[in-house]
């Protein structure tokens, strides 16, 4: 049991997150925790699912509250198997099935009715209801992701103040008021990572406009630039145009459309190769699509990578062809490293890229994606000019920290 007295009168802050896998929100959380002066703030971290390889990058001044932890990637097959075991344990061994049976059934029927069944959205409530409890009262508890971490923070954390982050387009995410069960009413502040994310969140929860603030993602820019110069990156000696995408292989990220765009580029005679850094549940599906399209040498799935930054530094074009977005850490990383960027014209992306100035925004069709890439390959001076503008973008908004300090 933790001592309830704050060490040296430091303010205590608990961060709660769903997993610590290698994804954008987790990277932003690590950068945010590094913003706090350890002589004034006592930081804690609780990982709801207790899994993810980025746990090893948690700053040394942060106390991890999980008693047991699995550092296998949440995207690897072994990691996904462990996640299933965790969910089954919550359902069967910790009484989650009995406790949340009505919630599961009613929301499952709602999903079926809406033709959008998402098992993970159902299970976050079960994981929150069966997670560890702590006696300590924190000065501030912060749920850093939607779903489980927000449910847990709202219902089970003993804190003087509570806040939650929203990183996604809430109108397209699959979360609903019924799933959320009133969790946002229990938070003192709601932080969205962009203006557009705030706008879309308030379409679902208009009554929380007064307590919703924009709090931009933080990045460790010095670390990104340092790691970009390390050994690694492309190893195939390809002499054509390299295209890079970094992100989980999920429906949201749109790799199925990207493969179709690559097929069009090949048919047009554009000498290019598209690389993907990342893993995910749809990897086998995308692999089959690649083979069916005859693109085995043209669209390459490299898998997850501990250090993606040499790839950013070495690529010719960074493409972010997502169906929807909150605020993309991958785009920000590409901007830090001065990449030529092309992205889909969707929520999130259009707030990060000024079309024709520091990147290209394209309509979300295979043909338009191919057009944007071809335009950049045929106009190197324009591409270089946009890459320079991208590298000069302001990334970190230090003044946003005041939104947290005012709660302490």
How does the language model describe each region?
Residues 304, 323:
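Aromatic "clamp/platform" in nucleotide-sugar-dependent glycosyltransferases that forms part
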Residues 333, 345-356, 360-361:
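Short acidic/histidine- and often glycine-rich active-site loop of Leloir-type glycosyltransferases
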Residues 340-343:
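Short hydrophobic beta-strand element within catalytic cores of glycosyltransferases
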Residues 266, 291, 368, 375, ...:
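A short, well-ordered alpha-helix in the C-terminal region of glycosyltransferases
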Residues 26-31, 241-264, 270, 281-287:
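A conserved mid-protein helix/loop that constitutes part of the nucleotide-sugar donor-binding site
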Residues 161-167, 171, 185-227:
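Donor nucleotide-sugar binding/catalytic pocket of nucleotide-sugar-dependent glycosyltransferases
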Residues 355-356, 360-367, 375-380:
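Conserved acidic donor-binding segment of nucleotide-sugar-dependent glycosyltransferases
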């Amino acid at each position: 049991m933790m001592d309830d007295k704050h060490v040296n009168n430091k303010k205590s802050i608990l961060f709660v997150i769903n997993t610590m896998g290698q994804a954008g929100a987790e990277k932003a959380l690590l950068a945010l925790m590094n913003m706090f002066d350890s002589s004034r703030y006592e930081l804690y971290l609780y990982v709801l699912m207790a899994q993810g390889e980025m746990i090893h990058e948690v700053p040394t001044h942060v106390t991890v509250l999980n008693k047991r932890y699995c550092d296998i990637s949440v995207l690897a097959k072994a990691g996904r198997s462990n996640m299933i075991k965790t969910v089954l344990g919550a359902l069967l061994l910790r009484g989650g099935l009995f406790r949340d049976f009505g919630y599961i059934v009613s929301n499952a029927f709602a999903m079926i009715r809406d033709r959008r069944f998402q098992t993970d959205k159902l299970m976050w409530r079960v994981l929150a209801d069966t997670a560890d409890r702590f006696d300590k009262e924190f000065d501030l508890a912060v749920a850093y992701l939607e779903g489980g971490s927000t449910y847990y923070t709202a219902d089970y954390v003993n804190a003087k103040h509570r806040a939650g982050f929203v990183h996604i387009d809430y109108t397209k995410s699959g979360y609903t008021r019924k799933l959320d069960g009133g969790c946002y009413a229990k938070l003192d502040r709601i932080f969205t990572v962009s203006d557009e994310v705030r706008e879309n969140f308030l379409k679902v929860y208009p009554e929380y406009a007064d307590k919703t603030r924009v709090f931009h993602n933080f990045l460790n820019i010095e670390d990104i630039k340092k790691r970009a110069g390390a050994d690694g990156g492309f190893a195939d000696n390809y002499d054509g145009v390299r295209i890079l995408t970094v992100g989980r292989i999920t429906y949201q990220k749109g790799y199925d459309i990207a493969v179709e765009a690559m097929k069009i580029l090949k048919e047009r005679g554009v000498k290019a190769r598209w690389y993907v850094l990342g893993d995910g549940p749809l990897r086998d599906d995308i692999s089959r699509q690649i083979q069916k399209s005859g693109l085995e040498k043209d669209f390459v799935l490299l898998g997850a990578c501990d250090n993606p930054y040499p790839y950013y530094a070495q690529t010719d074009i960074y493409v972010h062809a997502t169906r929807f977005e909150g605020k993309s850490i991958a785009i920000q990383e590409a901007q830090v490293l001065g990449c030529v960027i092309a992205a889909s014209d969707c929520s999130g992306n259009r707030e990060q890229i000024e079309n024709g100035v520091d990147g290209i925004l394209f309509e979300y069709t295979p043909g338009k994606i191919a057009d944007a890439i071809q335009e950049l390959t045929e106009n190197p001076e324009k591409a270089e000019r946009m890459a320079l503008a991208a590298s000069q973008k302001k990334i970190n908004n230090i003044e946003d920290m005041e939104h947290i300090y005012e709660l302490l």
